[in-house]
């Protein structure tokens, strides 16, 4: 009996990834899932990966619309979460073309976390309870105006992660 169970592990980076995979006539550009997505291979996101719940939600919808059976996505609870306000801050930063950021919120999220204004993946399942305060904290950190549409989309994406994908691994051993 073969007990081989493949798993793609992403150990760093974030949704700026854009690796294209092709298998049996199907093609997909991955940003959250790993390169085994078309083969049904689950992806594990290590604690150093930046996640954007909205990107995960949107990529899932694209995979489903392409008729792909979406494999599991395991997310370390310590992954740093990119909020819509991080994305806005990145895109508004006049140094975007000089600091190497791609405008996906990773640079702003990194800087925010470095300043101890954190939002980790372990909070996503509790978005109903904590998202308003967390988003206000991030919004204030970046000195941005409230955007209800983006906040609602963020909460919807966090709820999707919690209820539909059952992606969280409890524990921090990886």
Put a short name on every predicted segment.
Residues 1-174:
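Non-transmembrane, aqueous-exposed alpha-helical and coiled segments at domain scale
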């Amino acid at each position: 009996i073969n007990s081989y169970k493949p798993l793609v592990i992403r150990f760093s980076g974030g949704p700026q990834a854009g690796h294209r995979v092709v298998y049996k006539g199907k093609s997909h550009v991955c940003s959250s899932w790993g390169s085994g997505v078309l083969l049904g291979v689950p992806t594990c996101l290590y604690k150093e990966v930046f996640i954007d719940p909205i990107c995960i939600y949107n990529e899932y919808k694209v995979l489903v619309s392409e008729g792909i059976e979406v494999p599991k996505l395991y997310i370390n609870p310590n992954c740093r979460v990119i909020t819509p306000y991080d994305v806005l801050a990145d895109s508004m930063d006049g140094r975007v073309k000089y600091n190497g950021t791609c405008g996906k919120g990773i640079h702003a999220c990194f800087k925010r976390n470095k300043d101890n204004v954190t939002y980790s993946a372990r909070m996503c399942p509790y978005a109903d309870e904590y998202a308003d305060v967390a988003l206000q904290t991030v919004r204030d950190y970046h000195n941005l105006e409230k955007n209800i549409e983006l906040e609602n989309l963020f909460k919807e994406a966090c709820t999707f992660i919690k209820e539909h994908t059952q992606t969280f691994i409890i524990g921090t051993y990886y």
